[in-house]
Amino acid sequence: METLRELRVNLGWTIQKLADESGITRQAISSAERGIPVRADTAKALADALSRGYGREIKPLDIKDLSII
């Protein structure tokens, strides 16, 4: 299990690239990477974008230390 930041960096993506792919703001992604809780729909959008990047399903609960409110 990897953190949001690890998943993003391993794809070679910047925060801006993940923001573009997910439709989530850079600020929200940065906050999520620092452990600040995010809404369930935000977590799903991030997981969906990462899933497309990796070519495999990633669920929000698969992302280590992602806090969901």
Language-model segment annotations:
Residues 23-38:
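Recognition helix of helix-turn-helix/homeodomain-like DNA-binding domains
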Residues 40-58:
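DNA major-groove recognition helix of helix-turn-helix/homeodomain DNA-binding modules
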